[in-house]
Amino acid sequence: DPQVPXYFIFGDSLYDNG
């Protein structure tokens, strides 16, 4: 997922919109 401030979840990075 793109590293953009969207939803703060444990994904590819701290900021993950997916």
UniProtKB/Swiss-Prot annotation:
Tissue expr: Seed.
Domain of life: Eukaryota
Keywords: Hydrolase, Lipid degradation, Lipid metabolism
Gene Ontology MF, one: carboxylesterase activity
Active site, per annotation: 13
E.C. numbers: 3.1.1.1
Catalytic activity: a carboxylic ester + H2O = an alcohol + a carboxylate + H(+)
Primary enzyme class: hydrolase
Single GO biological process annotation from the record: lipid catabolic process
Family: Belongs to the 'GDSL' lipolytic enzyme family.
Function: Implicated in the breakdown of oil body-stored lipids during post-germination.
Name used for this protein in its record: Seed fatty acyl-ester hydrolase
